[in-house]
A protein has these predicted regions:
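Flexible glycan-contacting loops in extracellular carbohydrate-active proteins
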Residues: 68, 184-211
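Beta-strand-rich interaction surfaces with strong enrichment in secreted/lumenal proteins
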Residues: 87-89, 149-153, 187-188
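Short beta-strand and strand-turn-strand segments in soluble, beta-rich domains
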Residues: 142-145
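Extracellular glycan-recognition modules
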Residues: 27-31, 40-44, 52, 77-138, ...
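Extracytoplasmic low-complexity segments
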Residues: 2-5, 15-78, 183, 228-258
């Protein structure tokens, strides 16, 4: 009996110490986290704890099938579908940036990025040449001269994971396609923030024609391993379940085993 009690205690302690692994999708650096799992209403719930909820805009934006579960369906330039996220201080990036998302493109965009856009501050998403663009304004380079385009076209009619990162300390910008590095350059400087709203599914002019799922924005440059983990497991998979529910269910299991 003492052996099992000791084993249970060790197992529980190990589990508690591992909560940070389960919750890595939602850490102190996560400023926006969308699973699109609600599937109702006209508001997208932010799971980051920062309160950056999004609102539907456009004529036909709707819930639909995503990569993992629910997602959003965007109708392109005609209906001008997009998500509007009101400005907040948590969206004012300075030291770093990571934007991650799943997209399903019906067609390539007609101009610059239609993924995430905070105009004249930072954007990451598909662009008209069929590739991923990352664009910034820093205190060393302006919006027109601080851009990185991926090396590989994003295939249409299938789901693909896009990510872009920027680290102020190194000045390095990187873009990823399906978890693999697909381009990098040195931009340099600190990201310049502004009080513009943040958009999903549009740029200054073009609008996404396709679907979107699982968006995470962070205020640091995440590693390739972190990006790949979220891509492979999905937000729900990385979170597993909330720590409180996980602890309760695991402790109940251990008590049965005693």
């Amino acid at each position: 009996m003492n052996y099992f009690r000791g084993l249970n205690t060790v197992t529980l302690a190990f589990f508690i110490s591992g909560l940070s692994v389960f919750c890595s999708a939602q850490d102190d650096h996560t400023i926006l986290l969308y699973t699109f799992a609600t599937g109702t209403g006209k508001v997208v719930k932010d799971l980051s704890g920062k309160g950056n909820n999004g609102k539907f805009a456009g004529e036909k934006l709707s819930w639909g099938k995503g990569k993992f579960d629910g997602g959003l369906v965007f109708g392109g330039n005609g209906p001008r579908d997009h998500i509007v996220v009101p400005d907040s201080e948590s969206l004012w990036l300075k030291d770093g940036l990571t934007v991650e998302m799943w997209v399903y493109l019906n067609f390539w965009s007609t101009a610059g990025g239609t993924g995430e856009t905070k105009e004249k501050s930072y954007k990451v998403g598909p662009q008209s040449a069929g590739r991923t663009v990352l664009r910034l304004t820093t205190d060393e380079k302006d919006w027109g001269n601080a851009a990185l385009t991926s090396n590989t076209d994003i295939p249409t009619k299938s789901w693909h994971h896009l990510a872009g990162t920027y680290d102020t300390k190194s000045g390095q910008a990187k873009v990823y396609l399906d978890g693999k590095l697909d381009g990098k350059i040195k931009i340099g400087g600190t990201i310049i923030s502004n009080n513009d709203m943040l958009w999903l599914g549009r740029g200054q002019g073009p609008f996404l024609d396709g679907r979107m799922d699982e968006v995470r924005i962070s205020n640091i440059a995440r590693t390739e391993d972190e990006i790949r983990t979220l891509m492979d497991q999905g937000i729900e998979g990385v979170l597993a379940v909330s720590p409180k529910r996980k602890l309760t269910s695991t402790w109940g299991y251990l008590k049965v085993r005693r």
